[in-house]
Amino acid sequence: MRTAFISLSFLLAGSLMVPAIAHTPASKKKVATTTQKGKILPMKEYIDQLMAKMTLQEKISQLNLMVAGDITTGGALNTQVGGDIAKGNMGGVFNIKGLDKIKALQDIAIKNSRLGIPLLVGMDVIHGYETIFPIPLALSCSWDTEAMKKVGEVSAKEASAAGINWTYSPMVDIALDARWGRISEGNGEDPYLSGVMGAALTQGYQGADMRTEEILRADRIMACLKHFALYGAVESGKEYNTVDMSRIRMMNQYLPPYEAVVKAGVGSVMSSFNLIDYTPATANHWMMTDVLRKQWGFKGFVVTDYASIAEILNHGTAKDLKEASEQALLAGTDMDMCSNAFVKHLAQSVAEGKVTEEDINTACRRILEAKYKLGLFSNPYRYCNAKRNKTDIYSAENRQIARDVAAETFVLLKNEGNLLPLKKQGKIALIGPLADTRDNIAGTWSVAQAPEKYTTIKEAMEKALDGKATLLYAQGSNIWRDRELQKNGEQGKSIAWGDEVKMKNEALQIAKEADVIVCAMGETADMSGECASRTNLEMPDVQQELLAELAKMGKPVVLLNFAGRPTVLSWENEHIPAIMNVWFGGSEVGDALCDVIFGDKVPSGKLTTSMPKTTGQEPLYYNHQNTGRPVPDDNQKFAKFASNCLDVSNGPLYPFGYGLSYTTFEYGDLKLSSHEVNMDDWKITATINVKNTGSRDADEIVQLYIRDMVASISRPVKELKGFQRIHLAAGESREISFDITPEMLKFYNAELKHVIEPGDFQIMVGGNSKEVKIQNLTVK
């Protein structure tokens, strides 16, 4: 969702043009909010009383969500959005920054609308508010559920202090194609890991299960699961493109993370832009009602993505906006983001019998229940706390948490000769267009970022070195040779454009003087993210050419690769001795990077996406099905009449789960408590000894994979089923155990039933998806 990307002026221009709300003398009295004891009524009783006083159009208006636009404090009532709120024509607003602006709108809703129903106030708090954490793809590389929960807590604490009560996160779309820009916003290619991390983030945001009637704390906000569903499976990795897949693949590979977040108690769900079974997701009854509500038991409300009801017309399944609104409502969509479809047309649809007032009541009640659970009926201003607004945003405590989390997300891909960590001595050349940029380090979808407060990589290194070494700096290059391409990837986050030859010569000159060269290169923040698909995943031309010149100098070179997706680093892997994938590490990335590259902390991140050797391998993922003609080794050269390519071997450059450390880990033999288990008497444990064989205390991520050898349908070559992030002191050994549960062996069969089938399985444990210890298990 990004408001600037969709041009629907014919829908959004002018006032809402909805039927006038009847104001009879008897209806002017606002609903009672408390019992005689001063406590708010129970949720059902409260909402029953409120809805009994609402007109049909007022109920429909609760289903309307709009961008608030530019609000000036004191003049909000005179704006278009303020006027519509006063008329009771809006249930929520989103993407406003400024407590005073939000309070002004909430004032109008409470004091000027007939029933005084408070607003939902949403924002894309995707990986932080002003304290920005690493992009979600980077966060997943921490494999740290407690850190993920803390990210949600801090994000909610800051957003709620700024007047926000609803975030459009987590995104758990499985993405197998790195060409798709929004891979940056999810948790990678694995359904189990994505579900676990998404659930942890949701728990952090909300602090409560919104399937219950518990009212959230004032420093927590409602989460929104997105994009439901399959958005990450767009063809060719092209934004907003068609999705076409079998239901059996949906159920086994794509839907599990959404279900995990629903089971974690998420309060709302956002529908996706794409087709599902050739029907727009927003109008897909099977997905929105049969799967989401009936099968998974979701109790919250469904909001569309930006203007996606209007986009039903472009998909060609509705003749006009009125029909599109009917399709969306009847499918199970409750709230319309920015199409103005519901608020304009549903009253007429009720009059014509196309939808019923009970359909409207159902959607309205779901939204009012969310407001109740947010505590807005108890205190509409609980998210407008001026004191918290001054103390809880971008605090020293929050910044330290972000710094610590960022350090866990960096993935060390290569470290030839233990070049890293660097010593604080001699002369260090810092070169690259991303070394001294302030507004790119936070990454895409940093809506509320305050870059003027952030520290660049250059500034952080100067502070970390503290005179112990000399830091030499040169930008070195533009992002692209083509200025138009650079503008496309900036989206307002600019990097100075300079003379290519002059910048290159400056970089080569300081490199000659230096003992070691550190290169900060790669993508800008918005070369990944929404509407940022790429057909070539290699480092942009002019940067790679500079890197090649630096590599020829015979000096030690460290590449800090900035990216919002898996990129192609085949040339770099061959020629650069040390490579660290640093993604976009958020507001504190400068200090966090210095913690790691100078050795105060040890890198522990592991990839949650397979990194390709070439763009032509995409989509690329570890948990694929076998073919009838497999190659025995993913990295073997071409074999005739086998499933492979002429020019590149099948395997990734770096596999899923991979990441190096400043120490080494040794895995002993894998042991099972039994090699046979009966379905009616299930107890099986896998154990393995892991030893830190290096000289540094460090974290390791121990990964459990399972393969179903023979089943009624073809099963993946391996699937992640568990992991443990452990800390081992230098020389320490520990026995790690995994309970193998029946749930780990279940899958959806051809009848879409969730089953365990007896047979043979491989149990695998290791430090990444390629290097594993294996034992066999038979289920009877």
What is each of the regions a protein language model found here?
Residues 751-753:
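Short proline/glycine-enriched turn/loop segments at secondary-structure junctions
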